[in-house]
């Protein structure tokens, strides 16, 4: 209030390293599967924020700055990048939704961009660089230190989108088993985040065939994984 904004500059320096992982296909940006992973984004880089499967932007940080500039009645064409000064006056701030809610949205929408940015939060929390490598090391390191066998895992990103990623079926089984088992209660919330067959997320229209005695709808919680010519599913089924 009482302050006239004359220019908008975006500090995009929080994340380090490249913003596009090895093994990603640039065409996936236009398919809505991924965006360059930049520290400043609006709606995970979607060009149509109300549509989960919207194509993504190739310049999400710049777009975020331009959106702010337009809201402040500053010419969006003048937006530039700069590092924040060590001191300065805070004019406004915004807080993200709680982590558990962002994890839920990530799982239900199978949102690769959210997976990458949350991976960088884990990296920061464990003292690692907020980069692709730092996030992978943080996530796999935390699982391994908790007793989850990650032997054979070789990842270059946190979302699993890269064609260079390698996980074994045993890795996935170990993660789900740890969440369902009695020894790692901190992982139990993972089960609640998994989509429900015939009910939510990427399983909302699957496992609907059969009658009430044979259908998996409502009984299966699982996470899908899909790449070209590759499909996987890992989860739990409630039995009688």
Model-derived regions, located:
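Periplasmic/cell-envelope proteins involved in peptidoglycan metabolism and beta-lactam response
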Residues: 1-38
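Short Gly/Pro-enriched turn/cap motifs at secondary-structure boundaries
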Residues: 29-31, 58, 222-227
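Noncatalytic linker/hinge segments flanking ATPase motor cores
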Residues: 10, 47-57, 196, 216-219
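Solvent-exposed coil/turn segments that connect beta secondary-structure elements
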Residues: 11-15, 45-47, 199, 239
């Amino acid at each position: 209030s009482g302050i006239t904004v004359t220019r908008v500059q975006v500090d995009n320096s929080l994340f380090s390293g490249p913003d596009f992982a090895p093994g990603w296909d640039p065409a996936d940006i236009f398919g809505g599967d991924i965006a360059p992973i930049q520290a400043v984004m609006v709606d995970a880089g979607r060009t149509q924020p109300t549509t989960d499967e919207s194509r993504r932007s190739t310049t999400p940080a710049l777009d975020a700055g331009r959106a702010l500039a337009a809201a402040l009645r500053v010419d969006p064409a003048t937006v530039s990048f700069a590092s924040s000064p060590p001191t300065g006056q805070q004019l406004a701030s915004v807080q993200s939704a709680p982590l558990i809610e962002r994890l839920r949205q990530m799982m239900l929408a199978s949102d690769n961009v959210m997976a990458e940015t949350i991976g960088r939060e884990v990296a920061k929390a464990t003292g690692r660089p907020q980069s692709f490598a730092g996030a992978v090391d943080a996530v796999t390191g935390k699982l391994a230190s908790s007793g989850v066998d990650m032997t054979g895992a070789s990842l270059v990103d946190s979302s699993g989108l890269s064609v260079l990623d390698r996980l074994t079926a045993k890795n996935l089984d170990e993660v789900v088993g740890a969440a369902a088992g009695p020894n790692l209660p901190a992982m139990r919330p993972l089960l609640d985040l998994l989509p429900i067959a015939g009910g939510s997320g990427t399983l909302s229209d699957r496992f609907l065939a059969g009658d009430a005695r044979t259908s998996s709808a409502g009984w299966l919680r699982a996470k899908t994984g899909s790449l070209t010519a590759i499909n996987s599913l890992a989860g739990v089924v409630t039995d009688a």
